Amino acid sequence: MEAIYRDYHPKGVKFFYIYKALAHPGNNGYVAPFDHEERLRHVTEIKEKLGSDIPWLCDNMSNNFKHAMGNAPNSEFIIDPKGKIVSSRSWCSPSELREDLAELVGEVKPETTEAQVGMSPLDPPKTAATGIVPRLKLEGRMTALEVVSRQAGGEPFFAKLRVEADESLLKQGDGQLYLGLFLDPLYEVHWNNQVGPPEVEITVRQTEVTPDRLRGPAVEEPSDADPREFLVAVKDGQPGETIFDITVKYVACDDKETFCKPVTQEYQVKLARDADGGSRRDAMPRSPNGRRPRQPQMQDLNFQRARTMFHRMDRNRDGVIQKQEARGPLQWADLDENGEVTREEWREFMRRR
């Protein structure tokens, strides 16, 4: 992408990266931010590490841009000077982008190569020792739940709670609830294992949680930065309604050994899927040979979703959707600009993505 930028920025094409909700929290050691300031710190750090020349924009914590542009985690858009989207892809493709720009703006020869750009790899943030505490092995797919965080005393969220539910709990109210405490590398802190492990307390009405009091493992190493993970059983929950009140207590120590302080965090967790919560790659189930199951081809999956989206919005089944009634990417598929999106236009729009 940086190579394409160098070729087409002089031609007046403006490029932007947009930071959105993390699709896979934990990748490269990055923990999902809890506020906008933390997102901006991620942007600053990533830009410095990569040596990027392309400017960055940052979505707000309500993820309005992500929602408006179709929710794809790695999407790509070309917008003309009048504000019209002339090309879009649910998955960024630099080679196809270069072809589009060659057609729209003109071909550039010779092309800048990746080697000429000399980008630095995005290494994980430096932390205290990891690999000390074994990770929790989960069976089946887990889904992130909606979490609202509160912290007593105004301290940063040195550790961040992630809560996930299995399919049975999310749909039927009975199942397993995963809780993970992840130290945020932004704050350069570690667990002080000499003063005791983190503690978690779960309070909920008319729902049974076993156990409802949790304590992290005893660790011989004096410090580490591994996640603290727990799995509890839930019975008689109400999907979409049950609220878990969760209190977390731990001692945070900075890596420079300038402070150690007790921290209390409070969370409200709703038994409902967080559409912006992403998925942890380390939590995805693996096949017996240790590999993750193959997923459907991205293009096939996109066309399946596209057909479903059009069918859902075409309520009278006449093959036409009024543009003002369209949502998400359908808003941009009115190729002849007559105020309507036909099934044929939608197919052509998706073919170009």
Regions found by a protein language model. Give the residues of each.
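Structural microenvironment flanking redox-active thiols in thiol-disulfide oxidoreductases
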Residues: 1-50, 62-64
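Thiol-/selenol-based redox modules, centered on thioredoxin-like
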Residues: 12, 62-159, 277-282, 286-288
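Structural recognition of the beta-strand scaffold that forms the well-ordered cores
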Residues: 14-19, 55-58, 88, 322
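A short acidic/small-residue loop/turn micro-motif
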Residues: 74, 91-95, 197-198, 270, ...
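Generic structural signal for well-ordered beta-strand positions
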Residues: 86-87, 190, 263, 322, ...
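Extracellular/lumen-exposed scaffold segments
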Residues: 126-293
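EF-hand Ca2+-binding helix-loop-helix modules
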Residues: 291-312, 323-331, 343, 348, ...
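Acidic carboxylate motifs that coordinate Ca2+ or other divalent cations, activating on Asp/Glu
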Residues: 314-318, 336-338
